[in-house]
Amino acid sequence: MKEFADSFENNKITGIGLDVLDKEALRSALAKHDAVLNLTGPFFKFAYPILEAALEENCHYLDICDDWEPTEKMFALHELAKENNRTAIIGLGASPGITNLLALKAMTELDEVNKIYTGWDISSAEPEEESSQSDVNAAMVHGIEQMVGKVKVFINNKFQM
């Protein structure tokens, strides 16, 4: 991360290594910055506490959270963000994120929209001969969590588990 941040000519971008489970170290790091881009997964585990700490340390916040579980809790921090005059934007990855923006763009081109569906086409995906990962990573943990966990659905005008 530091190497990536250092590749920008603008020295206002920094990358740090941090144990985000160490609340004091997290708060100390956030206190030195105006904004945080949280890429720390799995998000069902780390998104809410990092957002909460960022807002309490008066940081603007962006992430690529793609887990529904913390998203509901994170929305509850809206008032804290408003009180601190901070912006918090969650779900800026591929899906949610780019898929939402593409759907919005498509909707603006139509006279009327009843529903929008997004999806992934993985039919052309080819398995790797050898994994590029030497260990379990956040994406793997996220995938398993989403496959075996419960999912909230919207049926008959209400959310259900």
Where are the regions a protein language model picked out?
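Short acidic/histidine-rich motifs immediately flanking catalytic phosphotransfer sites
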Residues: 11, 30-35, 56-57
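Rossmann-fold NAD(P)-binding glycine/threonine-rich loop
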Residues: 64-88
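Active-site-lining helix/loop region of Rossmann-like oxidoreductase modules
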Residues: 108-161
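ADP-ribose/adenylate-binding Rossmann-like module
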Residues: 42, 51-72
